[in-house]
Amino acid sequence: MEVLMAERADLVFHNKAIDGTAMKRLISRLIDHFGMAYTSHILDQVKTLGFQQATATSISLGIDDLLTIPSKGWLVQDAEQQSLILEKHHHYGNVHAVEKLRQSIEIWYATSEYLRQEMNPNFRMTNPSNPVHIMSFSGARGNASQVHQLVGMRGLMSDPQGQMIDLPIQSNLREGLSLTEYIISCYGARKGVVDTAVRTSDAGYLTRRLVEVVQHIVVRRTDCGTLQGISVSPRNGMITERILIQTLIGRVLADDIYMGPRCIAARNQDIGIGLVNRFITFGAQPISIRTPFTCRSISWICRLCYGRSPTHGDLVELGEAVGIIAGQSIGEPGTQLTLRTFHTGGVFTGGTAEHVRAPSNGKIKFNEDLVHPTRTRHGHPAFLCYIDLYVTIESQDIIHNVNIPPKSFLLVQNDQYVESEQVIAEIRAGTSTLNFKERVRKHIYSDSEGEMHWSTNVYHAPEYTYSHVHLLPKTSHLWILSGGSYRSSIVPLSLHKDQDQMNVHSLSVERRYISNFSVTNDQVRHKLFNSYPSSKKGERILDYSGTDRIICNGHCNFIYPSILHENSDLLAKRRRNRFIIPFQSNQEREKELMSRSDISIEIPINGIFRRNSILAYFDDPRYRRNNSGITKYGTIEVHAIVKKEDLIEYRRAKEFRPKYQMKVDRFFFIPEEVHILPGSSSIMVRNNSIIGVDTRITLNARSRVGGLVRVERKKKRIELKIFSGDIHFPGETDKISRHSGILIPPGTGKKNSKKSKKKLQNWIYVQRITPIKKKYFVFVRPVVTYEIADGINLATLFPQDLLQERDNVQLRVVNYILYANGKPIRGISHTTIQLVRTCLVLNWDQGKNGSSIKEVHASFVEVRANDLIQDFIRMDLVKSTISHTGKRNDPAGSGLIPDNGSDRTNINPFYSKARIQQSLSRHQGTLRSLLNRNKECQSLIILSSSNCSQMGPLNTLKYHNVTKESIKRDPPIPIRNSLGPLGTVPKITNFYSSYYQLITHNQILVSKYLLLANLKQTLQVFKYYLMDENGKIYNPDPCSNIIFNPFNLNWYFLHHDYCEETSTIISLGQFFCENVCISKKGPHLKSGQVLIVHVDSLVIRSAKPYLATPGATVHGHYGEILYKGDTLVTFIYEKSRSGDITQGLPKVEQVLEVRSIDSISMTLENRVEGWNERITRILGIPWEYLIGAELTIAQSRISLVNKIQKVYRSQGVQIHNRHIEIIVRQITSKVLVSEDGMSNVFSPGELIGLFRAERTGRALEEAICYRAVLLGITRASLNTQSFISEASFQETARVLAKAALRGRIDWLKGLKENVVLGGMIPVGTGFKGLVHRSREHNNIPLEIKKKNLFEGEMRDTLFHHRELFDSCIPKNFHDTSKQSFTGFNDF
């Protein structure tokens, strides 16, 4: 007893409350000290004590014990405020849907987390002995998150797919949920309505499909004799020890394992825990194990490839149905895992980014060249730095340096004042393996119907050549311009008669787009591309639509300025002031000159031609060169044709270069070869040396001509030129040599001291070269001479009859040289250089009454006669002044001007001179025919103007009366109207007041305004274009009121005075986001596109912006009509998945059905290419494909197994790899026969088993081409050997009908077929014995059984000498002896 007391005195006496972790520590110390049995007695006593105490204290839980957190109210309010601001930003188009979702989730997540942290201190301060507090924080019952849901807020929930619902549940269970909140919380909750109904069935269906794929796989042999294996390396840092042990235990080695010279494990030995520990301690070579992948049996599996049976730890028995076991082991945890769904929301966790905060107040400075602007994932503007960035913060007395790691976002600007603890940067969290990132697609649908516009160029996605999917190269807005549409099959018949003028889709006027910050994107314009070249696969084809429209209408392809097809003839039909050129592609009348060259029509962007401007040009193939060189035209007189007014026209076009007109008909081209090399490249020839043809210049370039080499080093590159020609070392007498760089005509004598005089045959170019330390010499270079023909005669361009008309429009043909004198021309490789361009110059006479016509308007017109479509360019001559009487004189009138029955004779679109007396009172909307969605009914877009609202200077009452009166009378202002998409230009001289806009409400006045300083005095105001929005067509019928859709508030007016100083310059076609300040009076209220600019107001067509970031795909064409609910954009974004199986199960299914967005196939393809390259290097060509193919299949199988394992492991569920392997083996075991190199056995596109394909190939001794495919589990179950099992799975009628027609035979090898037909299933460990016994019953006499006894002994002896016999004894020998032996025993 004393001893005990003494011992006890050593132990420390504790007196404190004990929680779960302390309890764990205590127990482990007890076990170490006293051993297991003793500890369990102690714990029993503790348990009894606890229960007695609990009964004595009688802890109970009442609803009043749930204390809510006082700060909750304002926290929630704050979060709501933030999400409101966010919603606004989204509405204005500053943030797109994905960013909004992300941010709102993070706002609520943060709020919820904060509340959760507040909870504990709150309990501790108010009532530490609160039963809820005691229970949850001692770990007895309930965890923090559950208590948080009781007293804090339930927070964010996920839906059955594991997607976040971005509507948080703000109340807690103490306060009670509203109906909506209850329904939302049903989704995530375990015993919720949704869970039991939806999830369990999902998991069950998964199991069913899995079992379906592998039901026929049974262990049938002991050893298939394969030599292949999969190697597992113990030293691999990626694999943790636990996973390694799990992978190895129960497997069979495929190869002997040596430790130095000693063999520590033999082939075909199964691995136990002892062996694994030895492998791990020795960390030996990679261990090669056998897996179901490597098994050579076709439709079943052998014992050694399967390994130990999971039930009794011995090698698996013959006849075990391992397939079904595998399917169920994978599917069953799924049903379990749906149970573990209680969670606080699988969220984008807040911990994805660390913040860098400012150490003190001060000014921040950093090097702006190292960063570039970008958006954070919440859509905030930020700077991204690629390399380490040093930021200095200067406060009054001290300078802090902060280092910001690469790939981080800077959230402040240079020289900004920051406060202490302000977040200045966000560090990208390292992608840890724990939070899985997955790529998700999010579609964004349009809220209203309208017309689609976008404000940058887009790429056509190369994968979708034939559809309208575009990729965005940079962040920009998509706009849906509102406009109701009306579908009808009757009305259009009265609209478009034969030969009516219709316009091709719509040529947009010059538009300048505006982004949120009112920065005009002038950089949107680029060089134009032809939209046809589909060069190398995968290159992006530019599809310009925003600024320079591409118009495709079947056979003709205009780019604006348009490029026509080859073989176009130009035809002109001209009447009076108009001039129409049809384009015909007629092959019969091929002119030898015009045949192959392209005529391009060049129209300035705003569609106005001035005198002597170029209408069309074509590049004569005779003046094309493939190589670089210099043009010279010596002393020839030249004048550049760039006049002042042209420059004004062209100020929008980037690609403007002067053209030079020739007086004399000859110029020269001196060829030279130019290589432009990077500065670092090594050059293999010396400066001023002479080389031959095909000499190596650099490592990978060779010269195409021989001659003299000149090397010039520029800043970062080297220009290497090669001149071909002769070298002359001149004597003293030689006069020529003093001149450098002159042209010598043929026929002149050339003096040389040694040789007699020679006459020159051709022109030559002489250049003097003085190398260092050497005598200078003269280099004579050959010259290509070009004669310029004196323009092509117009008669060859246009049919004769057209030219004979007396006409006031003239066309001249002029040749221009495109390069200046002496200017070196650089040709990029494989392009041709056009030296001369033949242009068609437009000119016209004075008008008859002496008023001069300054400009002409061009527009495209498409006329359809029967089924021939002709496209015309139409020129409208515009007089500067128009008399403003009530009648309107319309010299450029068009066939579709509605004239309310007064005079219907002007249907001829080519010539009409209409006088129209009535006002446009009837026509309150504009129509435009569309590309139909469905052929039967024609769709029209309506811009209704019956309910325009105007923010203007008039008061409403007067405004209404005046408008109604004036609509009855004639309009006070002459308005002329033209159908050309580019419109005509009247001068409007007098503003009565701004209400006149409503009279002409179906037109759009587009102004090219000049800001006049003394605007108040002058009444003679701007030039206006008067045009129908995008060239609308009016409806000539009085009954047209059906068409209008007056409920869309499409246009509205905005008071805006030009005389004010404004923050933004307003231009036509410009888009405004909501809340942009236009005038001083404050921000303006709606978003839209400016249609009309007046002196004191604007008309804006309302539009809704959608922001899209780079990489998003845009659906639909520019200008297409979208209806409500159509898909606009698809974003692909990464989000971190919660580790919840609610997302796990769909993930497993995605992998097994092979349909993930992360596209397994893509990564595999890249991997294949990588493999093939490397293997070629190692093995050389013929082997690489063979081995490459084998390896890829193996590689893809392993990566599939890993993907599935990852999901289950994240849930803490252990499934042995071999189960997954069996299934993956089935979905990868089929190959698709491809067309090339067809053998006569399989038809192309047929799915056959991999082994069968290989065997057939060997038997036929010819190659069968096939490629591996990944079938999903559903497809694999419908592509099995047995049609009975397929029919019992899905699509019964179809499968059976097909099988009957093909005459398929079912060999009843699997389990399911036999079950369906009521036979005995061919599995079970006693199965083989059973078969044998039935035989023996019939006719086997007794002597054999004695033999069997002997055989049994013989087998034991064999066992020792196994290696000796292995070669000569057939493989199945042991099997037979064993079977017959069991037979004898049973007897």
From Swiss-Prot:
Disordered: annotated segments: 883-903
Locations listed in the record: Plastid, Chloroplast
Pfam families in the record: RNA_pol_Rpb1_4, RNA_pol_Rpb1_5
One BP annotation, GO: DNA-templated transcription
Organism superkingdom: Eukaryota
Chief location of this protein within or outside the cell: plastid
Enzyme Commission number(s) of this protein: 2.7.7.6
Protein transport in keyword set: no
Keyword set, alphabetical order: Chloroplast, DNA-directed RNA polymerase, Metal-binding, Nucleotidyltransferase, Plastid, Transcription, Transferase, Zinc
Catalytic activity: RNA(n) + a ribonucleoside 5'-triphosphate = RNA(n+1) + diphosphate
Similarity field: Belongs to the RNA polymerase beta' chain family. RpoC2 subfamily.
HAMAP family: RNApol_bact_RpoC2 (MF_01324)
Protein name, as recorded: DNA-directed RNA polymerase subunit beta''
Species for this entry: Platanus occidentalis (Sycamore)
